[in-house]
Regions:
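N-terminal, membrane-interfacial amphipathic/helix-forming hydrophobic leader that caps
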Residues: 1-114, 142, 253-302
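Hydrophobic alpha-helical membrane-insertion segments
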Residues: 44-54, 86, 121-135, 227, ...
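Transmembrane alpha-helical segments in integral membrane proteins
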Residues: 90-102, 174-193
Length: 302
């Protein structure tokens, strides 16, 4: 009788291990992550390099089409386009650094979630931060008498209504969202893994002020650094990036209206409209499931 040969055991399937799912931390404080503190300067440098590179992508075609661009003068429309590209580059750099090492990235890790302390408490903190900053800035101006900022002239707000609208949207909506995403959402969060909240807030504030050296008078950099410090604490103790975006938008709206010479009545639409636009954008993203889906910001890689 012929014996049936024994079947060889099947080799075990070697499945690629799934990336570790980050666990959401206490929502009453800004998220705890495993982002290396040394990746914070990398994110900033990457954002600046990416912004410069992307700026060339915008500027070179403009030159090819006959736009007059010199070292001393850049057309207002091109300044707006370059600044928009810079803001987007900040977001891309922060997200890329968070993804290094094939990490899973979730929206809550960038503070894209409702304030864990509640909106009422968050609103009070926003009010206190802005009141303190306005008083400090007024006192500082009386001491140093800084020169008037020429940002609006650079953006061409007096050249046309369209440039005025685009400038206001860029300054009061786009910039607060993108800058908070990089500086508070990533840099501050990564630096907290080095020596804690206080030093991380100080360093982030200094970097935040320094980045504005090309658009603000030198005398304004210290108040901006202190505002950056305060925004870090606001993020840390509300658990959400949204209050910082709103505070940033309110501050920029007030500054924009002041530089434009508007009355308080004339400034109300911008002061209300900019934060409202951010809230509507957040609501739209949440409704689309971008911030709340199980795969969060990494759904394309899941």
């Amino acid at each position: 009788m012929t014996e049936t040969p024994a079947l060889e055991p099947l080799a075990p399937l070697e499945l690629e291990p799934l990336p570790d799912e980050p666990l959401e931390s206490d929502p009453r404080h800004s998220p705890d992550t495993d982002w290396s503190p040394w990746s914070a300067p990398l994110a900033l440098l990457g954002g600046l390099v990416l912004a410069a590179t992307a700026g060339l992508v915008v500027d070179l075609p403009a030159l090819a089409f006959g736009v007059k661009l010199t070292s001393s003068h850049t057309p207002a429309g091109l300044v707006i386009a370059d600044t928009f590209v810079q803001d987007v580059a900040f977001v891309v750099a922060a997200y890329y650094c968070a993804r290094m090492g094939h990490r899973v990235v979730r929206a809550w890790q960038f503070g894209l979630r409702p304030p864990g302390v509640g909106w009422r408490s968050a609103a009070m903190m926003i009010g206190l931060l802005l009141l303190g900053f306005i008083m400090l800035d007024a006192a500082w101006s009386e001491i140093v008498h800084p020169s008037k900022e020429k940002l609006l002239e650079t953006l061409g707000t007096k050249e046309s209504t369209a440039l005025l609208i685009f400038s206001a949207a860029l300054t009061c909506i786009v910039a607060p969202i993108c800058e908070e995403f990089l500086f508070r959402g990533y840099i501050f969060t990564a630096l907290r893994n080095w020596h804690g909240t206080l030093l991380a807030a100080i360093l982030t504030g200094l970097v935040f002020g320094g980045v504005h050296a090309t658009s603000a008078p030198a005398a304004d950099l210290l108040p901006l650094a202190l505002l950056g410090f305060g925004l870090c604490l606001l993020y840390r103790y509300t658990g959400s990036l949204y209050p910082g975006m709103l505070a940033h938008a309110l501050n920029n709206s007030i500054a924009f209206a002041s530089l434009a010479g508007w009355s308080w009545v004339g400034a109300i639409p911008l002061i209300i409209g900019a934060p409202a636009s951010i809230l509507l954008l957040v609501a739209a993203c949440n409704r689309a499931g971008f911030f709340t889906s199980p795969t969060g910001l990494s759904r394309s890689a899941a």
